[in-house]
């Protein structure tokens, strides 16, 4: 899943370590989310979106080719 977590985190002047502490996860989890190697739980995704003050669908961009209408 693509996301803009890294850009938003940096715009707030937060290190991965500090942001991870705020979200109560490891720095490695934040790194994996930012690189698209790990999809956060719904609870964590909402916590991240609340921290950034934006809607979840603007921060996490889900695209599944199987859902594309193939008319």
Regions found by a protein language model. Give the residues of each.
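Short basic helix-loop element that most often maps to the first helix and adjoining turn
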Residues: 3-22
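Residues in the helix-turn-helix
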Residues: 18, 29, 58
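Recognition helix of helix-turn-helix/homeodomain-like DNA-binding domains
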Residues: 25-38
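Short, basic-rich loop-to-helix N-cap that marks the start of a DNA-contacting helix
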Residues: 37-47, 66
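DNA major-groove recognition helix of helix-turn-helix/homeodomain DNA-binding modules
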Residues: 43-58
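Short, charged recognition helix plus adjacent turn
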Residues: 50, 60-71
């Amino acid at each position: 899943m693509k996301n803009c977590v890294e850009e938003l985190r940096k715009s707030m002047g937060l290190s991965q370590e500090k942001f991870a502490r705020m979200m109560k996860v490891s720095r490695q989890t934040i790194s994996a989310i930012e690189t698209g190697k790990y999809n956060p739980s719904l609870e964590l995704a909402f916590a991240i979106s609340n921290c950034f003050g934006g809607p979840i669908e603007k921060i996490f961009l889900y695209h599944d080719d199987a859902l594309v209408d193939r008319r």
